Amino acid sequence: MDRVLRDVFDYSYRDYILSWYGNLSRDDGQLYHLLLDDFWEIVKQIRQRLSHVDVVKVVCNDIVKALLTHFCDLKAATARHEEQPRPFVLHACLKDSHDEVRFLQTCSQVLVLCLLPSKDIQSLSLRTMLAEILTTKVLKPVVELLSNPDYINQMLLRQLEYREQMSEHHKRAYTYAPSYEDFIKLINSNSDVDFLKQLRYQIVVEIIQATTISSFPQLKRHKGKESAAMKTDLLRARNMKRYINQLTVAKKQCEKRIRILGGPAYDQQEDGASDEGEGPQSQKILQFEDIMTNPFYRERFGTYMERIDKRALVGFWESAEHLKNANKSEIPQLVSEMYQNFFVESKEISVEKSLYKEIQQCLVGNRGIEVFSKIQADVSEVLRERYYPSFLVSDLYEKLMREEEEEEPDAQLASEKDELGSGGEAGEEAVEGTSGVSDPASFAVIKLRELNEKLEYKRQALSSIQNAPKPDKKIISKLKDEILLIEKECTALQLHMARTDWWCENLGLWRASITSAEVTEENGEQMPCYFVRVNLQEVGGVETKNWTVPRRLSEFQNLHRKLSECVPSLKKVQLPSLSKLPFKSIDHKFLGKSRNQLNAFLQNLLSDERLFQSEALYAFLSPSPDYLKVIDVQGKKTSFSLSSFLEKLPRDFFSHQEEEIEEDSDLSDYGDDVDGKKDSLAEPCFMLIGEIFELRGMFKWVRRTLIALVQVTFGRTINKQIRDTVSWISSEQMLVYYISAFRDAFWPNGKLAPPTRIRSVAQSQETKQRAQQKLLENIPDTLQSLVGQQNARHGIIKIFKALQETKANKHLLYVLMELLLTELCPELRAHLDQFKAGQV
């Protein structure tokens, strides 16, 4: 950095100061050293001020939004005939040439005041002279040059022609190898950094195109209707995935080779690759599945992941694999340990909020362990796409392959892989084998056993969580409540089963009578309610065989309707009904009369041999919870059957309360932002892309594709990639490049560049046409893949036409200049506000 800055200072002093000062003074270098000290002081001031600038915000938000506003204003000003065009409002300083110079003078004066060394600030004449030089000899000529469409067209044409020449040179220099291994060998054997850079670019373009293709909506599978086309589609998707994976490995190898040869370190921040052991790369490529299913390989992969502080991913994969094959009694403890290790203490495994809630439900025994298999699959994809390619080009992989060649543990790999694979399948088959209940008669007993198993699981889970290093108080409280609920459900089921047995054993001996009646509110309306006492006819019966149930008049009417479908003669029996007259209240007379009618109805039912065996009657008289009494007797036999009664119940009726708890629970917000704002920094860029290329309906698809593309190509979220990219373009390495480019442009080969010749209108027009043609011929493949060929073409033409307006270019330059200078020197804001106020 210091060297290129010193070159710029030396050349400037030689050509702009010494050229006239040398004839006036016999100074032996005193002025040079004085000015050099001031120059380094100014550089120090600039560096200090730049350190306080949020470069990511300026580049990704402020500049992009300024460009978006510029294109929106241009679009409105060039509206079609059927629309009303809106005037394009220029920057305040472009009112006339005098105001333009005043604006630049204001900027120059503040810059000089902010950056000049403290010993020189007091000199008004020095500040005035330097500000005037900065205005007339630097800023004004730069603005005139950069806003000139002919200069822009020349730069575009020159750059595009240079890229064409380079591309043609590299196309002649290589052809793709016949196999993937040969392609990797081609990369490792080449020592031309420019060639490798071009090859890397081609690989990235190929990744982009493959990612775009793979993101098209796939045919949905329909159960039992898997067509040949669907199978082909799935096969294509799998092959595309493997192709992207191979390209990613090749890209990593290319970057590694470039780094070895002294080129830029593309992957220095992300893959943790060591410079040690940079020997020839092994040509053997282990498949990801082989690495994960072999403990020896997986251990080395885990060591690599530990180097980049991502060991938890492999650890979770191993824990989930162990959980699949664990004994039933071990599951609560293992689930608790996984929850504590990966989601409480470290939170290194990021999951969506819905999955996190499923984990908590599994922890308390409300769900199975399937959620860990889902997360394991996601973790496996992350390992495959982000870290597996980097591992293949790391020194650890090199050492692993060297050990493989020495020990040849192929037999061990096969046996261990088969053992692990068969163990997983056996576990799955064992789970699937328990899914059905073949004997309906044992349904109630099995339900009770399931409840007891669930209760035991929750008690074990509670014990594990209470003994954990960081017990979750919310989950402990929830578990205790659920244990109480299940205990109550067990008691209720046991009592219901016992009561049902009593009913069956004493069919024909039960009696029911209404002991009292009252008026209740139901949906804002009055409704009579009756208390029905059920007891055995025997005198001195057991106390537990007597109970009382409250029943509304509407429930009596529903019972009458159901039984009438089986016994048509019941239709002749009249039940009390409420008056339909408005404001008619229910009085004691109605309650007494209806009570007598309903008593007679009940006695009639319990004395009829066909009716007292009815399931509907038992459900009506049973005090068991409502979910035990939803029975449809239409078309069923009239004899009562306990097994058929229980079989009609929904399989999951005992877990309905737990599902409600799950719906309302919000035990943790962990993972809420995993997918929510992963592209917030890119939002202005998406808007700018949408405006330039007029995406309309394609906007969401392009957005998703860009996110997926960045994830696959760079192995990170788009937010992180944007931050890293901005950090890279503002790094010291790139600043050196910018200053070197400036130096070489002004002083090619160390000599001051000659002034540019004035070009004719015909020459400018020819350059414009050629530049536009070259632009359209060189639209990036990435862009065409993302937005389509037509949209890409229209967008490029829109950008090119926008650059052909001198005043519009000046307007944009002054907007950006104001934005950047006020970030560098916030003191400038007050002066510019005064300037704009004077324009009104």
From Swiss-Prot:
Entry keyword annotation includes ATP-binding: no
Any idea where the PXA domain is? 1-164
Any one GO MF term held by the record is: phosphatidylinositol binding
Question: Where in the cell is the protein located?
Answer: Endosome membrane
Gene Ontology biological process terms in this record: negative regulation of transforming growth factor beta receptor signaling pathway; protein transport; receptor catabolic process
Q: How does it sit in the membrane?
A: Peripheral membrane protein
Listed InterPro entries: Phox_assoc, PX_dom, PX_dom_sf, RGS, RGS_sf, RGS_subdomain_2, SNX25_PX, Sorting_nexin_C
Q: Where are the residues of the annotated region Disordered?
A: 404-437
- Give the record's keywords alphabetically: Coiled coil, Endosome, Membrane, Phosphoprotein, Protein transport, Transport
> Which superkingdom heads the taxonomic lineage of this protein's source?
Eukaryota
Membrane-spanning residues = none
Family matches, as Gene3D superfamilies: Phox-like domain (3.30.1520.10), Regulator of G-protein Signalling 4, domain 2 (1.10.167.10)
Q: Which family does it belong to?
A: Belongs to the sorting nexin family.
Protein name as annotated: Sorting nexin-25
Classification lineage: Eukaryota, Metazoa, Chordata, Craniata, Vertebrata
Name the gene.
Snx25
